[in-house]
């Protein structure tokens, strides 16, 4: 596909308004040294450009835009609406959010506005309109960046009133609400819309973050995601009313729980996101999150933020080791990014982000390790130009990721507090990552026909239409892999009666009678037909085969001998049911069989400790070969002879790759 950009955007957040003019001039020289070609500006400038209710002052922003335009930078223009000016909060305190404990916030920090405040909406839309009018003719503005990292929660009266409106639109009648939420439980029946209150610590969620009514709490999550999305759309539409062909985005946050990003992506021209792994985040988790961001629109995405060196807000803000930032950046491109952008370009001198990494450090020179590594990456990206732009990642495997399931599964008050949705998804993704098998992260309403294998771990909530969609996929020859805690509830978190796994029971060929929860110090053992045994933990389904072939059984406890892994023929395809959390080797045993029988393989045949990820154009395949391990690895023989896009030299059989080494090898198709 054609890229939305003419070059790889390389730059990041830039706040010259925090510095005197002589620093601006020095920055321009340093940016050229680092081969930086883009800047994200105006992210938190609302107070500067609108100093009072009826006054705008664009003088400084005009100077910044002119400076960057004269230097031929691609500008990412933010709308500044993520941090409210003090005058607004003073005059209109209702613009601030009310937190989980029922306390209304005062001025300060960010991520604390009420998305259902009509005052906030009015002034945010007006500001976006003024910015679009003022800079509509500037050809250097490549992207419009709405708000910043939408997040936070509000439980104020405005939100409560709008929640009731949202419910009326969704359910039409109170009888339908009562039925969906099963309000006969604990005598919660509603007879008037005004009786419905927001679910927070003062109401349904008063016990340790869990909820008395997951149906109510999950609906509030849906409502709040929609409320935030409406704010985004309000500003987006204001910009597009002036600039119809504007490329509009907002920066997402990976597996952030608060917002349904698949729904958001439908309203975004391009997905962008901020990547901040911790010092101990597995590289497979980083890769999975990139794939999720790519999967939101099934298109290349923008990396809007990463740090060139260290964060400031995690528990342990370790430095990126020499070569790590470069390798991490290439992993980002490998999984679908068409931009590499940092937060930030010059390190802040004050505030809570003064220790957050930047291209230009507090010493204020270009003679630092981080600057030199940034410049090296900039030179390399500039040298191979547009060749990777718009190229696609192709996959035979899809993994379902669904925010409704994310919310509902973690709201449920049983059977274990240790069940975490993202961890379960990653447990399966990691197998494919280690095998260098390309994966698409897909929504429940995606096109399943593109895949040979679909994994749906902990598909707890099977909503309307999902059963039929999955059945059609399997009947047509697809392989479905699902697990414990699947098929349990409907879209309102009411149990599918008739035995677990509910709507999946027929195609899986099993009936789950009970679910045993194992404490962290407990485990069981699973034995396969060849006698090989593997540990399992967390949960154990006690299930009965109803036509499915038993591949493995439990070895201990009163359910010893009962099935732990099954395989069922359904139409032309197969359904694997994994009834417990298997250790990695045991899961690999199951997934090896599932992938081999439908000829799903890695991007190369050889086994290797290197990550190898592919992007393709119509006539070229690019192999991104990266070493994220502590060991040296030899380049797989099948890649020898291909030209490295970075060096221009042909790779040789026996080439040794040290930790953080990267090659981008080209193959003509």
List the predicted regions and their residue ranges.
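Short, well-ordered coil/turn segments that N-cap beta-strands
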Residues: 6-8, 35-37, 69-75, 137-142, ...
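Conserved, mostly hydrophobic/aromatic
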Residues: 12, 31, 39, 68, ...
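An acidic-aromatic substrate-binding cleft motif
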Residues: 1-23, 28-38
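The substrate-binding groove and active-site-proximal loops of carbohydrate-active enzymes
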Residues: 9-19, 44-59, 106-125, 147-154, ...
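Aromatic-lined substrate-binding rim segments of carbohydrate-active enzymes
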Residues: 26-32, 40-103, 132, 235-242, ...
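Carbohydrate-binding surfaces of carbohydrate-active enzymes
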Residues: 196-200, 245, 254, 265, ...
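Short, acidic/polar
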Residues: 18-33, 124-130, 253-264, 321-329
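Polysaccharide-binding and catalytic clefts of secreted carbohydrate-active enzymes
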Residues: 102-270, 274-291
């Amino acid at each position: 596909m054609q890229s939305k950009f003419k070059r790889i955007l390389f730059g990041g957040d830039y706040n010259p308004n925090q510095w005197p003019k002589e620093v601006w001039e020095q920055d321009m020289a340093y940016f050229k040294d680092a081969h930086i070609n883009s800047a994200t500006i105006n992210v938190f400038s609302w107070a500067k450009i609108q100093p009072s209710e009826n006054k705008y002052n664009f003088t400084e922003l005009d100077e910044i835009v002119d400076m960057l335009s004269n230097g031929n930078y691609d500008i990412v223009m933010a709308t500044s609406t993520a941090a409210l000016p003090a005058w607004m909060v003073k005059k209109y305190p209702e613009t601030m959010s009310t937190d989980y404990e029922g306390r209304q916030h005062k001025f300060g920090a960010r991520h604390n506005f009420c998305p259902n405040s009509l005052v906030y909406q009015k002034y945010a839309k007006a500001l976006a309109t003024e910015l679009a009018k003022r800079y509509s003719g500037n050809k250097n503005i490549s992207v419009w960046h709405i708000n910043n990292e939408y997040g936070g929660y509000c439980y104020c009266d405005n939100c409560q009133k709008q929640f009731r409106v949202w419910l009326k639109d969704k359910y039409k009648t109170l009888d339908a609400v009562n039925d969906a939420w099963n309000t006969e439980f604990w005598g919660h029946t509603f007879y008037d819309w005004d009786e419905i209150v927001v679910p927070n610590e003062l109401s349904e969620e008063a016990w340790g973050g869990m909820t008395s009514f997951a149906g109510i709490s999950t609906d509030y999550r849906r409502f709040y995601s929609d409320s935030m999305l409406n704010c985004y759309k309000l500003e987006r539409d204001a910009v597009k009313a002036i600039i119809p062909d504007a490329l509009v985005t907002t920066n997402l946050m990976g597996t952030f729980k608060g917002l349904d990003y698949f729904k958001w992506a439908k309203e975004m021209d391009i997905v962008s996101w901020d990547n901040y792994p911790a010092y101990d985040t597995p590289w497979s988790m980083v890769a999975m999150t990139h794939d999720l961001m790519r999967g939101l629109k099934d298109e290349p995405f923008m990396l809007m933020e990463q740090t060139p060196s260290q964060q400031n807000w995690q528990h342990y803000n370790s430095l990126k080791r020499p070569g790590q930032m470069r390798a991490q950046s290439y992993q980002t491109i490998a999984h679908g990014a068409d931009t590499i952008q940092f937060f930030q370009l010059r390190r802040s001198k004050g505030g809570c982000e003064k220790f957050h990494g930047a291209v230009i450090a507090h010493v204020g020179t270009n003679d630092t390790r981080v600057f030199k590594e940034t410049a090296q990456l900039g030179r390399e990206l500039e040298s191979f130009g547009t060749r990777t732009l718009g190229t696609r990642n192709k996959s035979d495997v899809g993994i379902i990721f669904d925010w409704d399931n994310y919310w509902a599964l973690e709201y449920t008050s049983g059977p274990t507090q240790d069940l975490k949705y993202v961890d379960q998804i990653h447990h399966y993704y990691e197998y494919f990552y280690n095998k260098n098998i390309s994966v698409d992260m897909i929504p429940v309403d995606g096109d399943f026909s593109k895949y040979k294998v679909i994994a749906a771990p902990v598909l707890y909530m099977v909503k309307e239409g999902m059963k039929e969609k999955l059945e059609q996929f399997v009947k047509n020859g697809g392989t479905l892999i699902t697990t414990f805690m699947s098929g349990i509830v409907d879209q309102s978190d009411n149990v599918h009666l008739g035995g677990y796994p509910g709507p999946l029971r027929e195609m899986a060929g099993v009936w789950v009678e009970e679910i045993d929860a194992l404490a962290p110090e407990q485990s069981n053992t699973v034995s396969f037909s060849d006698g090989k045994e593997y540990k399992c933990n967390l949960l154990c389904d006690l299930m009965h085969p109803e036509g499915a072939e038993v591949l493995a059984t439990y070895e201990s406890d009163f359910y010893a001998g009962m099935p732990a892994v099954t395989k069922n023929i359904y139409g032309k395809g197969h359904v694997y049911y994994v009834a417990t959390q298997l250790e990695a080797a045991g899961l690999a045993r199951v997934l090896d069989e599932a992938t081999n029988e439908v000829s799903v393989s890695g991007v190369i045949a050889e086994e290797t400790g290197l990550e190898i990820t592919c992007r393709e154009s119509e006539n070229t395949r690019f192999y991104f070969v990266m070493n994220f391990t502590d060991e040296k690895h030899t380049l797989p023989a099948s890649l020898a002879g291909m030209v490295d896009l970075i060096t221009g030299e042909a790779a040789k059989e026996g080439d040794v790759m040290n930790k953080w080494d990267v090659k981008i090898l080209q193959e003509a198709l």
